[in-house]
């Protein structure tokens, strides 16, 4: 994902583009075919979040609260969605993730998953992996996404 800014050089009058990469990784959208009482977003807790004490919802699970931020417009509904079992499942998947990830569940049942891995879904790399290794990596990454989707099914 890139951000593109266009600007006009005063000296020449020509338009130029400045393109900056803001995200490199895999993402997936899944429609869960049901509505939810609120939206929620989970993303990694990082240095500045810890220093600034970003306002996030605490789940009561110390491991989850140390690793992730949770926001929603309805704290009680978000905590009903994120049951203790679901939180544990997310933590297990976090340990097997191939990059930092974020989850966004919308009221309309759209579940967005993004893993900042530094490469796209089917990037072959620079010849470092043979075809069997590539197939295994692709299957492992897709399995991680489907496992995370399964964690949110039947909420």
Language model regions located:
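Charged, low-complexity intrinsically disordered regions
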Residues: 1-155
């Amino acid at each position: 994902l890139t951000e593109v800014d266009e600007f006009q050089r005063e000296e020449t009058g020509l338009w130029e583009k400045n393109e900056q990469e803001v995200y490199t990784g895999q993402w997936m959208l899944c429609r869960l075919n049901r509505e939810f009482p609120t939206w929620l977003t989970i993303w990694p807790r990082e240095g500045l979040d810890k220093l600034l004490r970003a306002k996030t919802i605490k789940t009561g699970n110390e491991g989850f609260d140390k690793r992730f931020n949770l926001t929603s417009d309805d704290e009680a509904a978000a905590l009903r969605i994120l049951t203790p079992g679901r939180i544990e499942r997310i933590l297990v998947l976090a340990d097997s993730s191939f990059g930092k990830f974020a989850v966004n569940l919308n009221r309309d049942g759209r579940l967005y998953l993004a893993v900042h891995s530094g490469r796209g879904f089917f990037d072959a790399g620079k010849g470092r992996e043979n075809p069997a290794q590539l197939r295994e990596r692709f299957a492992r990454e897709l399995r991680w996404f489907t496992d995370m989707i399964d964690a949110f099914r039947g909420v």
